[in-house]
Amino acid sequence: MEYAKIAFKPEAKARMNELIDNLMVSMKERVDGLKWMSAETKKQAHAKIASFKRKIGYPDVLRGYVGLTIDRKSYAGNILRANQFQLQRNFKDLGKPRDKTRMGMTPPTVNASYNSTNNDITFPAGILQPPFFNFNADDAINYCAIGCVIGHEITHGFDDSGSRFDADGNLKMWWTDSDRKQFEERADCVVKQFNGYEVQPGLFINGKLTLGENIGDFAGLTVSYYAFKKS
């Protein structure tokens, strides 16, 4: 939390919420513009977009590390005690309702994620620093940087894997059979494109294995660009 107090101010969190709001609108408009998708599936996609939850910077409730002993003289000892501390905490959580508000990453972590079973996106304070995010920068900078990351994570809710989960995080096919076939035909174009990339002599990318990330990159950039044009 001390890191977040210094590195991620409340006004920065408000700005991130604004960016996410705008990208959600852009994503909905992109879905509306899909000529191959039926009105039935679009309705379900709208419901999923509206149900997205977000975790920005740091959790609202911090569990802390009371009871964990840190010794400056023993790095190995600190690692051992930290692992034991976390293991005991996990044991105490057994049998309790799952807390969906917890973040799967610490505030200083430089990363972002989408959780299909919660239908939520997470952006720790660590990634909300330059060059990804700069509160004092103009829209062009932030939509180009963190905007693409936001778009990428939102898109994971509709890629080859995330699209199999509904707005409530249930593993449920909410697409019509025809729409799913249309999606898979288009996704196969991305698979074939990346199958053709030779990273080393005779070694090619597995486009099917990287499909979700590639869809996220393509669509994330597009969604962020259209959101920027309206900013």
What are these regions (language model features)?
Residues E2-S231:
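Intrinsically disordered, low-complexity linker/terminal regions across diverse proteins
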